[in-house]
Amino acid sequence: MRFSPTFPALRAAFLTVALFGAAAAPCRAEGLEGRFDVRSADLELAGGVYHLNARLDLPISEAVRRGLSEGVPLTLEVDLDVERVRQLLPNSRVAELTQRYDLQYNAVSARYILRNENSGQQQSLPTIDAALEQLSEVRSLPVLDKALLHPDRRYEASVRAKIDYGHVPFTLRMLMFWVNEWHRESDWYTWTLQL
């Protein structure tokens, strides 16, 4: 079986060379402009279900912006853990959730497509900045049934955001391992639940 290059394969090769060139260039402050951060988060009770609301700060470098505009997908994971706080024993996990959002540029429509991977809902946005603004707001995400929490116990919730590049082609994934711009992860943002 012979390899016959196709347009996607050639484009992936071009992106690999472009990203490799960016990785081989001397490190600059631009590559690590800011870090991911969870600015605020809370769980709001509505209809017997707790919903997550969070505000994220997601600065990305010019290299990542270029990659997105050339068709490299970006997957953001928002992880949530809810634990029962215990005195003498380790905390026990009550719930955990990983919400994934895919952001990809569609060259045909010249728009950025933001897709909620868990629900399948998607939005079409005109610019990368509009897409990142939308991505930085987690609103009314159902995460936990009220019946799982007892009012006489103490609970803590923790949220973090990170880039998952497991969905990109293998050649790019191997290269991204060495490029700092694609390794972004916030610290855990933790708060005590008010029941």
PLM regions with names:
Residues 25-29:
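Sec/Tat signal peptide C-region and signal peptidase I cleavage site
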Residues 2-14:
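Bacterial N-terminal signal peptides that target proteins for export
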Residues 11-23:
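Bacterial N-terminal signal peptides
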Residues 143-195:
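Glycine-rich, aromatic-bearing surface loops/beta-hairpins
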Residues 31-43:
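N-terminal edge beta-strand
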Residues 66-129:
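Structured domain cores in non-transmembrane regions
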